[in-house]
């Protein structure tokens, strides 16, 4: 058939039933471009012409006249529809239908159903078309009931009111977690679905479920033609009794496997968390051990340098100045109650007094080290990278005041020209 003849067939079907162009093309392709068969498929009126032919000659004449009139009007329609810009002035010739997604189409159908009959209908899947519904039940190992209806069929209103709005059927489907989808075969996707499931009469109901034996979806039941809720429930009950036990066993086994897998996952997570805590504790213990070892090593280094410094100080203590130099004469009282009297240069700072006290304490605290430092003929050098900290404080007696190492002796009247110094050890 030529392209122009095909277009004429599409236009004729659309003018007769007002279906979208893509749906009209799909239907006509399925019926080898026979417009009459396509109309009968969508309306279910295959025997109407035969019945009408029995009404007598008068009706036959009327039919012939009507056919001629319709043919003439159709040709005029075809000519006008091809005139450029005609749709701009006469909107009826324009193609204004918007192509909807499967989800939008499903939602539109349910919305129309609610506008006509109310909201107490079967719970429908509206996230997509019938393919999305089948994908979902395959993923979830479930059951789906697909309704294929035709808005051009005389039984459409009765079916919608008595079946799609039936509360007993709704409860039956909900109790068994059956996913429901409905589509109008005057829309392209629903028509393709009806052809896939070989639905030749409308409305049709197709029960699809996952088969554990085949690992794929199978058709468990099909109902065509005049349907009522009780017959649907009866047929679904029989089909489910035959196929559902194996599916439920499969689901139970699958749930048991998933529960065992989840338990193993939780146990593994708990074990890994325990290992992580152990590693964290071990890492903390190692870090603490390393810190303590480092601090000990640093203290030992400082202590070693301190001994070296005190040994150097002991071997290099300056002699007492003579009386002619007008020195400061200080009486030094130690924590053990002992006293020492010594002269210091008036131009020296109080640090020289601190050095002398450290010298005396070194002798008291570490006599062996002190003896080696003062008796050795080998010169002792001060340690590098070391700042000596005195482990005591010096105070004047009257008035009691802290003596700072950096202050000149001659500027402090409490110790110059003479005075008493008290030694207090740090805690």
UniProtKB/Swiss-Prot annotation:
One Gene Ontology biological process: positive regulation of cellular response to hypoxia
Keyword tRNA processing: no
Compartment(s) of residence: Endoplasmic reticulum
GO cellular component: Dsc E3 ubiquitin ligase complex; endoplasmic reticulum
One family name in Pfam for this protein: UBX
Key words of the record: Coiled coil, Endoplasmic reticulum, Ubl conjugation pathway
Residue ranges of every copy of the UBX domain listed in the record: 323-425
Molecular functions per Gene Ontology: ubiquitin binding; ubiquitin protein ligase binding
SUPFAM superfamilies attached to this UniProt entry: Thioredoxin-like, Ubiquitin-like
Coiled coil: 247-311
Gene3D superfamilies, sorted: Glutaredoxin (3.40.30.10), Phosphatidylinositol 3-kinase Catalytic Subunit, Chain A, domain 1 (3.10.20.90)
CDD domains reported for this sequence: CUE, UBX
Cell membrane keyword on record: no
Role summary: Involved in protein degradation through the ubiquitin/proteasome pathway.
Name of protein: UBX domain-containing protein 10
Lineage: Eukaryota, Fungi, Dikarya, Ascomycota, Taphrinomycotina
């Amino acid at each position: 058939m030529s392209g122009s003849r095909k277009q004429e067939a599409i236009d004729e079907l659309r003018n007769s039933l007002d279906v979208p162009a893509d749906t009209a093309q799909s239907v006509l392709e399925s019926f080898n471009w026979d417009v009459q068969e396509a109309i009968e498929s969508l309306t279910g009126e295959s025997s109407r012409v035969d019945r009408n032919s029995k009404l007598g000659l008068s009706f036959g004449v009327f039919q012939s006249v009507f056919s001629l009139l319709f043919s003439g009007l159709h040709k005029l329609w075809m000519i006008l529809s091809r005139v450029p810009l005609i749709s701009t002035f006469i909107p009826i010739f324009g193609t204004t239908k918007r192509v909807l997604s499967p989800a939008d189409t499903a939602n539109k159908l349910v919305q129309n159903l609610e506008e006509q009959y109310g909201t107490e209908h079967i719970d429908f899947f509206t996230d997509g078309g019938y393919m999305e519904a089948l994908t979902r039940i395959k993923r979830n190992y479930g059951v789906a009931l697909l309704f294929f209806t035709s808005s051009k069929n005389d039984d459409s209103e009765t079916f919608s009111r008595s079946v799609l709005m039936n509360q007993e059927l709704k409860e039956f489907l909900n109790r068994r977690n059956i996913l429901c989808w409905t589509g109008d075969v005057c829309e392209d996707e629903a028509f393709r679905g009806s052809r896939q499931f070989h639905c030749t009469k409308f409305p049709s109901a197709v029960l699809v479920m996952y088969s554990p034996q085949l690992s794929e979806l199978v058709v468990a039941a099909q109902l065509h033609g005049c349907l009522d809720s009780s017959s649907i429930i009866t047929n679904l009950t029989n089909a489910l009794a035959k196929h559902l036990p194996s599916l439920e066993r499969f689901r139970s086994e699958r749930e048991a496997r998933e529960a065992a897998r989840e338990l193993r996952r939780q146990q593994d997570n708990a074990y890994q968390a325990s290992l992580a805590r152990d590693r964290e504790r071990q890492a903390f213990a190692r870090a603490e051990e390393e810190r303590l070892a480092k601090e000990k090593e640093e203290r030992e280094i400082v202590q070693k340098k301190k001994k070296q410094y005190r040994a150097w100080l002991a071997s290099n203590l300056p002699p007492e100045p003579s009386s002619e130099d007008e020195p400061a004469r200080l009486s030094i009282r130690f924590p053990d109650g002992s006293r020492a009297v010594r002269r210091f240069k008036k131009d020296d700072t109080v640090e020289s007094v601190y050095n002398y006290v450290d010298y005396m304490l070194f002798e008291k605290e570490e006599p062996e080290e002190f003896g080696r430092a003062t008796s050795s003929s080998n010169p002792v050098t001060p340690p590098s990278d070391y700042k000596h900290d005195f482990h005591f404080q010096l105070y004047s007696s009257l008035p009691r005041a802290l003596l700072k190492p950096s202050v000149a002796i001659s500027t402090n009247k409490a110790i110059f020209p003479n005075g008493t110094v008290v030694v207090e050890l740090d805690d």
